[in-house]
């Protein structure tokens, strides 16, 4: 939502929060004038720490496990989302799911949003991505490592990544974006493949880079 706003667009953040950490996230969005519709549940939203070592050029992620959210709570959140949707809206489903969430959650959500007339962007990994792909979202944005895991082999060259992306197109996905860090990104659809090299900039942290690609 923050990147979309900086690029001149509008969005609404929808999700599940808990406790003081969740309140801090909500307050931060309010402070930036960003629309949201969160459901609060018992517990505490997890805190993820990113330790950046500028001398060795390394990032260390310390991610807490997070709270458990059951299927009825997720269903209520989905209904909140569907009530907001208008035909032609774009829905971004991104990230991991909380403990307790059914493995086919993204499949269910993609299907439901498509029936409401929305275009769904899916940014996930592993089994969550595999399940979501079964519902043929409008766009998916794996990075090169995620796409390699999906295909069961290491994809090194641009041609290998492009071929794997086209395999997703043949499964009914209209648009595929493959982010490759400092190597740039690939954009694929049925009749074209476009390669965009990365800008040469000093990297402070890569946290949120993939999310920013989706927002753009």
Where are these regions (language model features)?
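Substrate-binding N-lobe of the ribokinase-like
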Residues: 1-45
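Short, conserved phosphate/pyrophosphate- and ester-handling motifs at nucleotide-, phospho-/glycolipid
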Residues: 4, 143, 210
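Short hydrophobic/aromatic-enriched beta-strand-loop microsegments
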Residues: 11-15, 33-39, 137-148, 195-200
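Cofactor-binding loop segments of dinucleotide-utilizing enzymes, especially the Rossmann-like FAD-
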Residues: 16-19, 41, 54, 96, ...
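Conserved phosphate-binding/catalytic loop of the ribokinase/pfkB sugar-kinase fold
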Residues: 50-87
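Conserved beta-alpha-beta core of the PfkB/ribokinase-like small-molecule kinase fold
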Residues: 90-160
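Conserved phosphate-binding/catalytic region of the ribokinase-like
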Residues: 111-115, 130, 158-216
